[in-house]
């Protein structure tokens, strides 16, 4: 079973490269911390497998908040580790703006049901 983490970023916000990098990092760290603090043994199994595999991370894009929310809701429905990132609003965008979501680490075939059709950022 191969695993991966996917971060889905909104492109309608016109964030700079550094801002996007920070938001993606927030999502990745948040996912790992959420799993470590969770009682979900399956998620922890996926996390440890992902760590053994070299922590594959993929960053993809969506054009809108609506599309991001659809992906988030589908990940929740499939009971995958999922996080949603809201910006603090200290630099480029308004406080509370949802910038990206993170999904996984989880089996590739499950994550691909949600993000497999999206283009790389």
From Swiss-Prot:
Transmembrane segments: none annotated. It catalyses: an N-acyl-L-alpha-aminoacyl-tRNA + H2O = an N-acyl-L-amino acid + a tRNA + H(+). Keywords: Cytoplasm, Hydrolase. InterPro entries: Pep_tRNA_hydro_II_dom_sf (IPR023476), Pept_tRNA_hydro_arch (IPR034759), PTH2 (IPR002833). CDD domains: PTH2. It comes from the Archaea. Pfam families: PTH2 (PF01981). Its EC number is 3.1.1.29. GO terms for molecular function: peptidyl-tRNA hydrolase activity. It is found in: Cytoplasm. GO terms for cellular component: cytosol. The keyword Hydrolase applies. GO terms for biological process: translation. Its main location: cytoplasm. Belongs to the PTH2 family. The natural substrate for this enzyme may be peptidyl-tRNAs which drop off the ribosome during protein synthesis. This is Peptidyl-tRNA hydrolase. The gene is pth.
